[in-house]
Each structure stands twice: as C-alpha cells, then as structure tokens.
Design a protein with these regions (language model features):
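Anionic-ligand-binding alpha/beta catalytic cores of soluble enzymes and soluble regulatory domains
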Residues: 137-235
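Active-site-proximal beta-alpha core segment in soluble small-molecule metabolic enzymes
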Residues: 1-165, 179
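A structural micro-motif recognizing beta-strand termini
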Residues: 239-241
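Short beta-strand micro-motifs in enzyme catalytic cores
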Residues: 86, 235-237
Length: 241
C-alpha cells in the first residue's frame, strides 16, 4: 500500500519514466487514483473486488483472476457494460495455497476462456513461497517446473502471446533461469536485499521528530497492556510516524 510508504504516485511516475512494462497495486481504488494523477502505464489489480469491476473498466485497470467464480462474475460484468477483450492476468497456485487456479484446472480454464470474448488473457503468473531460503530450493524448483508446465498448457490454447512471470525480488537474484518474460520487483525496488551479498543498495530514509522524552525508572512499563517492562532506568522518546 502506498508503495511501502514511499508514495504511490511518486514511485509510479518514476517507474513510468523508466518505461516499466506494468505497475501493480492491491485494489482498484489505488489504480484509479494513479490514473487520476496522470499515470498511463498498464496497471494490474492484485486483489480485485467484484464490486469494483466498473472502476476497472472505466480506468483501464487489469485484474488478477484466480478462480472460476471471479472469472464468471467478471465476464458477466463486462458483457453488461459492453466491454470486450478486457485484459486479465491468470494466477496459478503452485504452492502458496492462498489464491490461484490449481494446475489441474488449467485445461478447463482454457476451454472457458475460449468460449467468451469479454476477457483476453494478458499474462499468467504465480508466487514463489521461499525463493529467499536455500532450505526451500527443492520446493522452489518444483514450483517453477509446475508453473512452466501449467502456463504452457494455457498458452497452447491461444494464438496471442501470453506473458509469463513468477520471480519476486529474491527469485530474480537466485533463479535467473526462471525470469520468463517479466519479473515482479517488490521490496527490492527500495534497496532491501533479502541476502547479505550487498547487490542492492538502500535508497530510502525514514525521518521523524521527537515529541517528548520521559525519564522512566526500572520496573515501570511502557505502552498498552504493560508489555514493555523496563529492566533499568531509561530515557523513552515518543515519535510520530
């Protein structure tokens, strides 16, 4: 939300100036705000709400689609509005087990997509579970292989090119062979490196002011529910964030 606090418009404008392929935001309202602020880049909505389909149509916001229920609702909404070939992004669940079509559902999904003209698949993607940890390497490779097979099945059902992407910040660095057509750089955009090899450099600074300083003796508590117990005499500063 709000580009990790760095400012949605400011980050979006910078990325747009550098000609990124896509921006991604959580909900449709965020995307609409970027459009109103003058951002013209393609925008993916990662958590699309059924009640926000009209907003997506009006502001050219492209939803992630992760279930048959969501797909059917989107098709119906598009047909009501007279919308055709509306760009969507298919999510495949390769192991995160939060949202996404099961790989076994892809043949059925292809058949359903072929029978309608309201939506057109722009990309297919998945999320890596533990690409930042060596202990999960075997599972990460399994996810990549599963995604490659499922996305190939999806692509074979259509003549137009469907963009594929699975790598997050850690995946970009550790699995260059899995970068496919596009990657999703998240926290790494701000220089936060999931490893200690210093390939990324921190580009942000958080500054604030001190509102008040208290001299508090040992054995007193700080904060709600008295959870912060002081083991020594302390100087406590309150700061606004």
């Amino acid at each position: 939300a709000s580009a990790y606090g760095a400012g949605s418009f400011e980050i979006a404008k910078t990325l747009e100036d550098h000609r990124v392929d896509y921006l991604a935001v959580a909900v449709a309202d965020e995307g609409a705000d970027l459009r109103k602020a003058g951002i013209n880049s393609s925008i993916i909505i990662m958590n699309p709400e059924i009640t926000a389909f009209k907003t997506m149509f009006d502001y050219r916001l492209e939803p992630e689609v992760y279930s048959f229920h969501l797909l059917e609702e989107l098709i119906k909404a598009a047909e009501r509005e007279g919308v055709s070939n509306f760009p969507i992004h298919i999510k495949i669940d390769t192991g995160m087990h939060r949202l996404g079509f099961a790989p076994s559902e892809i043949p059925q999904l292809v058949q359903r997509l072929q029978k309608q003209s309201a939506d057109i698949t722009r990309s297919v993607f998945s999320r890596l579970v533990g690409s930042d940890a060596e202990r999960f390497d075997a599972f990460t490779r399994h996810q990549i292989e599963t995604f490659e097979a499922a996305s190939t099945t999806l692509q074979e059902g259509f003549k137009h090119k469907i963009i594929r992407h699975i790598c997050n910040t850690a995946g970009i660095e550790r699995y260059p062979g899995a970068q496919f057509d596009m990657v999703r750089l998240g926290i790494g955009l701000y220089g936060v490196d999931p490893f200690t090899n210093k390939m990324l450099h921190n580009v942000t600074t958080l500054k604030t002011t001190i509102l008040q300083i208290h001299e508090v003796p040992a054995d007193e508590t700080v904060g709600y529910s008295r959870k912060g117990v002081l083991t020594r005499d302390s100087r406590i500063a309150a700061i606004p964030i």
